[in-house]
From Swiss-Prot:
Protein's UniProt name: Nucleolar protein 12
InterPro entries in the cross-refs: Nucleolar_protein_12 (IPR019186)
Coiled-coil region: 33-97
Lineage of the organism: Eukaryota, Metazoa, Chordata, Craniata, Vertebrata
Annotated function: Multifunctional RNA binding protein that plays a role in RNA metabolism and DNA maintenance. Participates in the resolution of DNA stress and the maintenance of genome integrity by localizing to sites of DNA insults. Also plays a role in proper nucleolar organization by limiting nucleolar size and regulating nucleolar number. Mechanistically, regulates the nucleolar levels of fibrillarin and nucleolin, two key players in pre-rRNA processing and ribosome assembly.
Length: 216
């Protein structure tokens, strides 16, 4: 029996021993490093938010610049069309005065060049009754309202992203101030002493005074 046990022990594969070394410095660094790692993560998050905010602002500026250039080109084109129409339209004014013994009468005749009649605008010939309407349409076409420059971007998502990023940045950068709760006044909790209540010394003095009075 003893030989068999020795053979079994010799045949078993023994596992290598594990040696654990306790390092006090690493333990202290691990336990006290939670706050440090938290501050580092907070700084990294703030830097990332700043980078994203810069990218969104740059994109917004580029879009506004493109819109401004487009609006400027439209205005220049409208001014060129107005100048061309002003060159084509010629007006002649003739005034004739008639003197009377009591008053003076002046007759003014204004004749404008009809662009539609000269086939300059490519419109059909108007009738005599519609000449006044065509003149009003020409005047209204010349006086086109100018568009205002875009103050905001057409994409509302960019402005929303920028506002949300700035809000989160302010929330991260703001320091938390711990407010201490005011202590409750002790006067409000304590009941005022009653006027009729007397202390032990006062009662003893009263009893001794009565005893002396009775002895006399």
């Amino acid at each position: 029996m003893g030989r068999n046990k020795k053979k079994k022990r010799d045949g078993d594969d023994r596992r290598p021993r594990l040696i654990l070394n306790f390092d006090e410095e690493k333990r202290r660094e691990y336990l006290t490093g939670f706050h440090k790692r938290k501050v580092e993560r907070k700084k990294a998050a703030i830097e990332e938010i700043k980078q994203r905010l810069k990218q969104e602002q740059k994109k917004l500026r580029e879009e506004r610049h493109q819109e401004y250039l487009k609006m400027l080109a439209e205005r220049e084109e409208a001014l060129e069309e107005a100048d061309e129409l002003e060159r084509l339209v010629t007006a002649k004014t003739e005034s004739v005065q008639y003197d009377h013994p009591n008053h003076t009468v002046t007759v003014t005749t204004v004749s404008d060049l009809d662009l539609s009649g000269a086939r300059l605008l490519g419109l059909p010939l108007p009738e005599q009754g519609d000449q006044d309407g065509s003149q009003e349409e020409e005047v209204s076409s010349m006086e086109k309202p100018t568009k205002a420059l875009p103050k905001k971007s057409k994409d509302p998502l960019l402005s929303q992203r920028i506002s949300s990023l700035t809000a989160t940045l302010h929330a991260h950068s703001r320091k938390k101030v711990k407010r201490k709760h005011p202590r409750r006044a002790q006067d409000s909790t304590k009941k005022p002493p009653s006027a009729t209540r007397t202390s032990k010394t006062q009662r003893r003095r009263r009893m001794t005074g009565k005893a002396r009075h009775n002895g006399e």
